[in-house]
Amino acid sequence: DAALVVLDAVDGPQIGTARAWKLSKERGIPRFGLVNRLDRERADFKATLEQMRKNHGKNVIIPLYWPVGAEANFSRVVNVLFDKEIPAEIADDVAECRGLWLDAIAETDDDLMMRYLDGEELSDDEIREGLKKTVKTGRTIPVFAGSSTKDVGITELMDAIIELFPSPLNYVTVDGAKRKIGDECDAIGIVFKVLNDPFSGQLTFVRTVSGTFQADSDVYNLSRPGVKERFGSLLFMNGKNQTPVKSAGPGTIFACAKLKDTHIGDTVAVNAGETPLP
């Protein structure tokens, strides 16, 4: 669907960060960047931003939200396109980002570009629609500022995911066919994470794409012909806490213990005749 790459405002991009950018670019999916932990000592939004821009370019990596305050004084974020009351100390940075966004948005439509070059102001609706287009094509990567522990900037990020990322209802299979999504469909999902838990052993994380998986049921690994697995308890994860559930419907993320031959990127389904997901 899309990718959210989380960057550390203290330590900057890591080896895994570069790999995440590379894989998401190869897939041709929309991408967001989140500069997290901005409330920590030595956190530096601008330095992290510049490190990203070294690899992708200033006209591609553009903050959509800019932080107000630094380290322990980090208190909120402002939208560079729509917020009007901007603190004086970040006004120049916000204005520069707004200009970069308007340039990118104007490029999504010839008529929009002509009017923009003639000095005409774009409406809020035109900006929103152009923003969706440029993010969808991957020509721009919005950057967000936040602190997950202080819950600053996270609501804005979640709202943007809903507004700008592709709808999960528009899912296609590996052969390009559009897939019907709904509770009434046969359950199918994709594995996105595997880890070893000291108490539960190997945990496999699955996102349900369509249908509803049930606890204590058999599933087929469509990515590995002939492989059949058994879902025992389905677990909702909240940090280290595990909550067993009986079922997991569309959009749900759950974990399952002790799968033997299922790996990251594999498609699992209750129907062996389904087509794997990309």
Regions found by a protein language model. Name each.
Residues 1-278:
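Structural and coupling elements of P-loop NTPases
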